[in-house]
Amino acid sequence: MKALIVDDEPLARNELQYLLNLNDAIDEIEEAENIEETLEKLLYNTFDLIFLDINLMDESGIDLAQKINKMKRSPHIIFATAHEKFAVKAFELNATDYILKPFEKERINQAVNKVDMAKDKPKNKDKTITPKYIDYSDDERAQTHVLPIEVDERIHILNFTDIIALSVNNGITTIDTTKQSYETTETLNHYEKKLPSSLFIKIHRATIVNKEHIQTIEHWFNYTYQLTLTHEFKYQVSRSYMKTFKQQLGLQ
């Protein structure tokens, strides 16, 4: 495969080129340090993948990615950056992967392998469509429909609809989804600010649940409820959150 590295820092380009040269799937590597040089190379060459930094001197890598996506045969875009805050936007642009600096050989190989497996398949440039049964209209935080979380220096993009519950214990926040569970040291409050209140309910100072995943509600001790969610996850509604919980589910 033919790769293009776009970064305005020579050391970053050299490091990435060194790691790519160790990968047998990469046959040829070219470099560019700015937008103009990148577009010129894309005009006269065909690349399978492009490693793209976000903070370029003359323009944002996000803006460049938008231009690349309009090309008839656009390369797979792998954002390679020191900043995690653009992860959601990157995946909205249908990026194949998002890698954080400093680079690691294993992580680079994972990204290359993704492209190698997908390069013969047509790229879907349509954005993810949110199921119609969820009404996000009153909550601006739901406009992205996804929650980025960082686990072991890797960012995972979780669809709101896949998240079953979030809970914290001994400083570790566990995010249970329909596919797997994730553990992170980020606070529950951090995630609460990013979740739409139209979909997620706080039932305890240490627990937030997705109301679309509530299967049954049982009366529990001290006039509280016990919830059974998707995959048989069970959580208790704290007495101090009972009133709000009933209101949000229309139980009053």
Curated annotation (Swiss-Prot):
**Parts forming coiled coils:** none
GO CC annotations, alphabetized: cytoplasm
Q: Name one GO molecular function term.
A: DNA binding
From what superkingdom does this record's organism come?
Bacteria
What InterPro entries does the annotation carry? CheY-like_superfamily (IPR011006), LytR-like (IPR046947), LytTR_DNA-bd_dom (IPR007492), Sig_transdc_resp-reg_receiver (IPR001789)
Q: Where is the HTH LytTR-type domain?
A: 147-251
Alphabetically sorted, this entry's keywords are: Cytoplasm, DNA-binding, Phosphoprotein, Transcription, Transcription regulation, Two-component regulatory system
Q: Does the keyword Glycoprotein apply?
A: no
Give the location in the cell.
Cytoplasm
Q: Does the keyword Ribonucleoprotein apply?
A: no
Name the SUPFAM superfamilies for this protein: CheY-like (SSF52172)
4-aspartylphosphate PTM sites in chain numbering: D53
- Residues forming the Response regulatory domain are 2-116
PTM annotation, UniProt: Phosphorylated by LytS.
Please give the SMART domains that the UniProt record associates with this protein: LytTR (SM00850), REC (SM00448)
Pfam families referenced in this protein's UniProt entry, alphabetically: LytTR (PF04397), Response_reg (PF00072)
Function, as annotated, reads: Member of the two-component regulatory system LytR/LytS that probably regulates genes involved in cell wall metabolism.
Q: Which NCBIfam families match?
A: PRK14084.1
> Per its record, how is this protein called by name?
Sensory transduction protein LytR
Q: Which organism is it from?
A: Staphylococcus epidermidis (strain ATCC 35984 / DSM 28319 / BCRC 17069 / CCUG 31568 / BM 3577 / RP62A)
